[in-house]
Amino acid sequence: MTDGLPERFDVLVHPVSELRGELRAQPSKNYTTRYLLAAALAEGETRVVGAATSEDAEALIRCLRAWGADVDRVGEDVVVRGFGAHPRAGMTLNPGNAGAVARFLMGVAALTTDTTFVTDYSESLGRRPQGDLLAALERLGARVSSRNGQLPVTLSGPVRGGRVEVSAQRSSQYASALMFLGPLLPDGLDLRLTGEIKSHAPLRQTLDTLAAFGLQARASADLTRITIPGGQAYRPGRVLVPGDYPGSAALLVAAALLPGEVTVTNLREGDLQGEREALNVLRAMGADLVREGDRVTVRGGRPLHAVTRDGDSFTDAVQALTAAAAFARGTTTWENVATLRLKECDRISDTRRELERLGLTATETADSLSITGADRIPGDLTADGHGDHRMIMLLTLLGLRAEAPLRITGAHHIRKSYPLFFRHLEELGAHFEYLPTDAA
């Protein structure tokens, strides 16, 4: 592996007294996914500058190659020669455990015939709901077969486009999938989002991506209606992937929990990633956090206090911020986060259980998680990473402040979004032991 770690491993997190140093934020997972797909939908060559190297990115690249794109890593960039509006028919695609990749590709699969989606992660991605997207594609005229709205799924076009509704109650990814498809349809797309929209920020990232590739799209202020003219073409070119706020939030929380000073660069101030709000939440909790342009510095060790926040806009930072809540005075509540139950694991119930295992008090409702802070965590036990990269980040941060080492199972799943997470923390002064395992 490029990180120099075992293929599969548990990690033993040792407590540390301080963290200090400067890191460049890893490339955004969300933007890498969007830019690579858009590049494949363009005819011609696109350079995606500073693309992520996560398992999700690699899963997408494999699928795009199967569909006929020529994709090459050149240093830190990815060069894509796309298939335009004509991905290969009759292919079987395996998006690994990448939910956004699977959904975006399912939308585009309406340009093909007999594209089948499978996964090796039957207990994770295989259980995640796809029915709302599949129903919208059927309403557009696609032929769809699935296992009760879950993978495996087979899709066939063609579709012409027009007006269609899609539920945004469970995920905004369904709408994004249709938005990537829309410009290539003869009649375009008049997309109506129904239900309470979850995660506005990713929808704005998709609109931003379409604009970067020369496409026209109009959206109402509340994003309930998105209109995309048909007969357009994705324009190849050069796009720069911004820094990743969800992963960087974990670094900044770690910095806040321990004495020292940590700076993370490459965090664009006006970025559309919703997890940018994590910086404001951390500051509201009492962290000494200062921004200078794209540089964010945290001077750690200050006492933190509890907050109550609607977490819908920064769901991918909730686990990292939960580590801050675990040591904050009072009870922190993340509200309106029901979508966390539909991730790689149930990030509400599974988080509560892991916090209780560590001696903390946590409670949950259908759409909220509350954490009562403590002065200390004993450590000296094994926590379950639940095969979830965000859970692994949370548990790692807790382990850095524990009184004795904390073992986390299945820590190799960190590679889904942040392959260098442990290595970056080591650069700041953390100490880990990597324990090879045969477990999946």
Curated annotation (Swiss-Prot):
GO terms for biological process: amino acid biosynthetic process; aromatic amino acid family biosynthetic process; chorismate biosynthetic process. It is found in: Cytoplasm. Pathway: Metabolic intermediate biosynthesis; chorismate biosynthesis; chorismate from D-erythrose 4-phosphate and phosphoenolpyruvate: step 6/7. Transmembrane segments: none annotated. Phosphoenolpyruvate binds at K29, G99, R128, Q173, R347, R390, K416. Its EC number is 2.5.1.19. One of its GO terms (molecular function) is 3-phosphoshikimate 1-carboxyvinyltransferase activity. Keywords: Amino-acid biosynthesis, Aromatic amino acid biosynthesis, Cytoplasm, Transferase. SUPFAM superfamilies: EPT/RTPC-like. Gene3D superfamilies: Enolpyruvate transferase domain. It catalyses: 3-phosphoshikimate + phosphoenolpyruvate = 5-O-(1-carboxyvinyl)-3-phosphoshikimate + phosphate. One of its GO terms (cellular component) is cytoplasm. Belongs to the EPSP synthase family. Catalyzes the transfer of the enolpyruvyl moiety of phosphoenolpyruvate (PEP) to the 5-hydroxyl of shikimate-3-phosphate (S3P) to produce enolpyruvyl shikimate-3-phosphate and inorganic phosphate. Monomer. This is 3-phosphoshikimate 1-carboxyvinyltransferase. It comes from Deinococcus geothermalis (strain DSM 11300 / CIP 105573 / AG-3a). The lineage of its organism: Bacteria, Thermotogati, Deinococcota, Deinococci, Deinococcales.
